[in-house]
A protein has these predicted regions:
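Binuclear metal-ion centers of metallo-dependent hydrolases, dominated by the metallo-beta-lactamase
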Residues: 89
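A conserved acidic, glycine/proline-rich C-terminal tail/linker
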Residues: 74-85
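Acidic/polar low-complexity surface segments
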Residues: 68-74
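Exposed extracellular interaction/assembly regions and N-terminal maturation sites
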Residues: 1-64, 103-126
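Extracellular disulfide-bonded cysteine-rich modules/repeats
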Residues: 92-100
Length: 126
């Protein structure tokens, strides 16, 4: 499943992933710039599904060194919070990948903006 999404941060957006069935792939293709506000974008696992323990996601704060958040056991939500600026790491042409290799468990990967000005956007597991 590839979802082209025009999330801008102007309104909160909640996405529930499909059931984590072996072979399922979900791609979030970001089609717009997330410069419209600071409302969150969340990806929640369905039912009893979880993110793989030890999954990594990059988080950035303006003027600060980027950090990596690591998922703990039984976490089910990935939250992205943009800055109200044109400097977010989730912008035109970036992708979030959710892949299932083991029933009930989502693996996560990402291709975020990497330029010098893409230095905002907080991401965290819960």
């Amino acid at each position: 499943v590839i979802t082209v999404n025009n999330y801008t941060g102007a309104a909160a957006q909640a996405v529930t992933l499909p059931a984590a069935t072996v072979g399922t792939i979900v791609v979030h293709a970001q089609s717009d710039d997330s410069t419209g506000g600071t409302n969150t974008l969340t990806f929640t696992c369905a039912g009893n599904d979880v993110y793989r323990t030890g999954s990594k996601v990059e988080s950035r704060a303006a003027g600060a060194v980027q950090t990596i958040d690591t998922s703990a056991a039984n976490e089910t939500i990935l939250t992205y919070t943009p800055a109200n600026a044109a400097t977010n790491s989730l912008t035109h042409g970036t992708y979030l990948y959710f892949t299932c290799f083991e029933k009930g468990i989502w693996n996560f990967a990402y291709d975020l903006a990497t330029g010098n000005t893409a230095d905002t956007g907080a991401a965290a597991w819960s």
